[in-house]
Amino acid sequence: MKLYSLLSVFLVILLATSDSDAFTRNNFPKDFLFGAATSAYQWEGAVAEDGRTPSVWDTFSHTYNRGNLGNGDITSDGYHKYKEDVKLMAEMGLESFRFSISWSRLIPNGRGLINPKGLLFYKNLIKELISHGIEPHVTLYHYDLPQSLEDEYGGWINRKIIEDFTAYADVCFREFGEDVKLWTTINEATIFAIGSYDQGISPPGHCSPNKFINCTSGNSSTEPYLAGHNILLAHASASKLYKLKYKSTQKGSIGLSIFAFGLSPYTNSKDDEIATQRAKAFFYGWMLKPLVFGDYPDEMKRTVGSRLPVFSEEESEQLKGSSDFIGIIHYTTFYVTNKPSPSIFPSMNEGFFKDMGVYMISAANSSFLLWEATPWGLEGILEYIKQSYNNPPIYILENGMPMGRDSTLQDTQRIEFIQAYIGAMLNAIKNGSDTRGYFVWSMIDLYELLSGYTTSFGMYYVNFSDPGRKRTPKLSASWYTGFLNGTIDVATQDTIQLQSNISGSSSL
């Protein structure tokens, strides 16, 4: 590795954009939030400290055959280093920080007694953020169900989860709601149900028997729809509680987030256009149509039939309007076609992708470790939601680019990726989308749920070999700082000199 013994590294980046794409932070409304994100299991570590009990991710990462992906036992050690991280956020100029609460740290048995040390940690974290002028955006659930509830009744495929999730949410609203004004109930609800109960790639690892993944239990033709149904009802129940009991005094907002691929027809044929609409109904409408109109998309009801649960009239009314905003998690875009071609997941005999009945082809020239930007995909998502779902308020809760671990601090490709998506988001806003915030994934290097420590998304490098988990800024941290404080404009052929205070080395 080539070393540069410099106190500062100056890089010149040519940002080639069109005149119409030129923008600065000032082009966005003053109350628009720019931030960065993490999640509890991926950031905190300290999995067996101060009363925390195992979540399903602890079990999954330790017991399932996932190669050398590791686990989140220590990860970035945010539990002990949160003050240092908040200071870095403040230095970066973050306006908001999105994090999740570990249910099993706050309520170790899943219900009942609150863990005072867990409660104190989150109170201190929120206090630290606010003291530095950073708005907390709190996710209640990011894949990490207490293992005790999974063992007791099977977690999200059992309607008992609705009552337990609502009780857990009640504790969070009561204890943190005076200082938290933005709540996301459940993280990327669509891909959570698919990954956990159809594909078996995330806990509890359920899927039908197949030659690709060795799931010990599950039914891919029914369980993802059961889980999705209970996710929606749990969200609606928590939202109803918040609005009846807390909203009038706490003045906050509550929403649900979905994972959204950009989806575009592979050709201009009518068949591909119909296939794309069907894919949007399954990927977006599965969660969004109940939240806005109270029922599932007709395309899903026709295809899935009796395997798709039915909302009662009361449930339908409770769902409508239960999200004050929609959270969008977006990374990449696919072309959609009816014609056979490689799909995003291996073909299986049953499940969500068979029901959807389309083939998906990557629109980006990407590898597992490096994604090409396709910002037009995000712009298309925002336009579609505006037109199809009454233009709800939207927060882009995750967007970012993976790179190989220990590759470089000069992550210029990540900078180009992020600025391209911010530009696309601005275009959508100019066209009427009610988008109100953007969060880079991720604030610092973390334990990535699907790739472990083989990839990193962070704007700060974390040395996972160092017991102290030393943080070092990447160039993207300096770029984001400059963009947020107005010293960097994204404009036509601008030559922008970024100063990154990287001591000793620009490569790792």
From Swiss-Prot:
Residues 1-22 form the signal peptide. Glycans are attached at residues 214, 219, 365, 431, 463, 485, 501. GO terms for biological process: anthocyanin-containing compound metabolic process; carbohydrate metabolic process. GO terms for molecular function: beta-glucosidase activity. It comes from the Eukaryota. InterPro entries: Glyco_hydro_1, Glyco_hydro_1_N_CS, Glycoside_hydrolase_SF. Its EC number is 3.2.1.21. The keyword Electron transport does not apply. Disulfide bonds join 207-215. Coiled coil: none annotated. Keywords: Disulfide bond, Glycoprotein, Glycosidase, Hydrolase, Signal. SUPFAM superfamilies: (Trans)glycosidases. The active site is at residues 188, 398. It catalyses: Hydrolysis of terminal, non-reducing beta-D-glucosyl residues with release of beta-D-glucose. GO terms for cellular component: plant-type vacuole. A beta-D-glucoside binds at residues 42, 142, 187-188, 331, 398, 441, 457. It is an enzyme of class 3 (hydrolase). Belongs to the glycosyl hydrolase 1 family. This is Beta-glucosidase 10. It comes from Arabidopsis thaliana (Mouse-ear cress). The lineage of its organism: Eukaryota, Viridiplantae, Streptophyta, Embryophyta, Tracheophyta.
